[in-house]
Amino acid sequence: DVYKRQDLSFKEELLILLAFLIGFGIKIPMWPVHTWLPDAHVEAPTSGSVILASVLLKVGGYGMIRFMLPITTEAGIYLSEYMIYLSLIAIIYISFVAYAQEDMKKLIAYSSVAHMGFVTLGIFLVFNLLGSNSSAAIIGLEGAMIQMISHGLISAALFFCIGIVYKHSKSRLLKDNYGVAKFMPIFSFMMIFFLMANSG
């Protein structure tokens, strides 16, 4: 109710939405402002990567849901189609970038950007469907929230696994870590389980 009493003009809503997009888009991170995340994960210790992936990235998604949806509804509807295209680019293009990585932490970091693309896709589908199909909009919002929760759990588990591998081999490169299943079969099973969950 408080948000609806603001009586913002469309131009004011658009400016506020752009400010939210800059702040929350960098925090999620959205393509093309995602470049800080892989370097942050590579430089961070395992515990830092776990906290960053499981909690801190979700702040951007929470901010979009909590503030953008109620405050900038009209501007969000206006820009939703463009943001859906950006989200789809993030999902497809960044998945190929992740596939090319040799460092395991960078691989998971880039896959996180692609997964957050699904979150922004769900949020902006809500804007796109408001008024025309409310049940589909609710499904989009629920999907975005479930994706944030599942990504937080799965990526945190993968960064823990990479930390264990690094502790034993002193390398995060894929080429240096062949044959782990021979020495740690249960751990390898768990890591494959989390990798399959990460793939969707």
Regions from the language model: what does each represent?
Residues D1-G200:
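Hydrophobic transmembrane alpha-helices and their helix-loop junctions in integral membrane proteins
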